[in-house]
């Protein structure tokens, strides 16, 4: 496979609203991010993926953009962004922007114009359809956030498509003028010096000409647009054009958010010779159906996690590049979702999960606070939630649905995206050192124990463990490029694999359970070098090993 800087990089996702507030208004901002660059440099990350900081009415926390070339005032100014970029580059840290071009805000000038009349020059920047004969929506598709995917606009008595909120109308990528404007905007950011893009729901940008009803829609309910709009008819054509017009002219890292992507489809988006993206995010290991739609209260079975991650490791090797993640701004906290967040096991299981992920082939992503072992938040009441998806879920299942508050609330507690969006826990001062004002969302009360200052004062903390994992990746090519082989594929507790490159071989052993387990290692690993251990193990002389609860051990021979 071809070498590229992003194959050896570790990415840190910053959700600016919750990272660091410099001006005391309770909302994280760009100056706040800049003020914490030394912390990120100490951790050792190479890239910051910055969640959206563009001008936005904030219906979906910045994923509804009203001006792609302006900064949201609550985050600061363009001068603040330029300073962040300069200071990051000075520290050898690259900046990747979130790019949201499946849809815009309904307050974007394009849409303000588009809705004025049927013959407006911007009409075809969006997807408009006539009502059915009875005046109802053009088809039965539902939106990702609940309700119909169509909104009637009284100005022209036509419907526009919105796969997300009604305030997020979908852009019409069939229109070459729209594509030209998007490429111009991307070029403007590249010329400014940004180092790449994370492309939001990029697999949805191509819509079919025909938009039939989903025949499998529940009676009286909404259908699924996925079969028609995900990996749509022209998506690869558009991305190849984007690559030729913009991406290939710069040394960028690009990652596409591609829900529902298959191995075969991923190779089209991010194959070595596809000329589209550097890599994609697949969500097969985290998007598991729950009892009520996506809402669940139980962890994803470890055997399922192992099977899915191993499939992607094995089948993309040598063909395309993996993105490695367990958490992001849309997922519960990693240690709560996959590990054991009880105080006695939180640190060890957080280290174990990090080991399991960071020893794989691909580019690892750390979500802010993951390096501290931050946990899900014990929200007390509905009014503490801020996330549109959570509030819509409550309305769907409780207000308009069959469940009581007490029946559904545990599902919100476990799965809400707000778990990832509580403020970064910097120290044990009020509001976890995130703000001197009133935070926009509540702070997790465990900040008095779980915080960056405490972690940096403790040589055995998760912070320094992540730092070591990052350093190991830079020191050992086998971690970056080695071939993956899963051992014990049917064991429900042990996630064990090898990585092999030339004469170097790693053995990665992770115990996902609270029970100790004996295991016999392959020959040649007894007495091998201990690369990293979350239990303080310095050697393993015997071929049979007793793995402690949530133990992770990596040997190199």
Question: Where is each model-derived feature located?
Answer:
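Active-site and adjacent substrate-binding regions of carbohydrate-active enzymes
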Residues: 1-557
